[in-house]
Amino acid sequence: MTDLHCHILPGIDDGAKDTAVSLELLRREYEDGVRNIAFTSHFNSERTTVEAFTEKRQAAFEQLTAALEGQPMQFDFKLGAEVFFSPGLCELDTRALCMGDTAYLLLEFPTTHKPHFIRQTLYQLQQQGIVPLIAHIERYPYVLEDPTLLYDWVAAGAYAQINAGALLEPKLCKKLCKFIQWGLVHVISTDTHSPDKRPPRMAQGVQQLEKLLGKETAARIVRNGDELFHDQELDAATLHQPKKFLGMWV
């Protein structure tokens, strides 16, 4: 399995504070069956530059790989970022923020409000050869309230990711299952930050998908993560536009 969204690199953001925590998170990922990991530390262009971020990220990665020597775990890693949305994003060297040598960019939106110019920015990114992957769509109230927003972004060429832990919350899981059936969710990841407050729960999330939507759907979403990691086109489900009927999205 592949984890495309995590905060495991030590001391770079609000994730793992040191290599000991990083190693514990990797151990749990390995036990869950994860073998491919994209390290997606937070990047905000209002707080740092791409150059400063990538230098800090590389230093943290080298620190972690040194600590991994002799450990009974083998992974394939890529360096990426969880990039906070801004209308001027396309003016940056966004290729350096993609997941390794892939064209995929993990993009985070504000949770408090829907930002302006999303469609335009998604289009501009794709004109640059970059494929946006929208992070943890379950965390945006405006998307949960109006799934046609996400439909428009996906129809325009973006992909969407959900956190495995969200599938363990019954009410939220019910909504996300609808999103998956509409073809609006493509990959599952952990967004892990720490062993206690936000541990990796990939195996539990996949088991929940199998239970509620069947093994075929769960396998497709897992396979999508593997394909994205290797810069391949995803096996996207047929897209269905959500419609409101008697006050409910169907």
Where are the model-predicted features located?
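An N-terminally biased module of ancient metal coordination in phosphate/nucleic-acid-related enzymes
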Residues: 1-74
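Active-site beta-loop-alpha junctions enriched in small/polar residues
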Residues: 7-9, 42, 80-84, 110-112, ...
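Non-catalytic positions within long, well-ordered alpha-helices that form the structural scaffold/packing
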Residues: 30, 126, 180-181
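Extended substrate/RNA-proximal surfaces in nucleic-acid metabolism proteins
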Residues: 48-161, 236-250
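Short acidic, glycine/proline-enriched helix-loop-strand junctions
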Residues: 48-57, 64-65, 71-76, 197-224
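Short acidic/histidine-rich active-site segments
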Residues: 184-200
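Mid-to-C-terminal alpha-helical segments outside catalytic/metal-binding sites
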Residues: 206-250
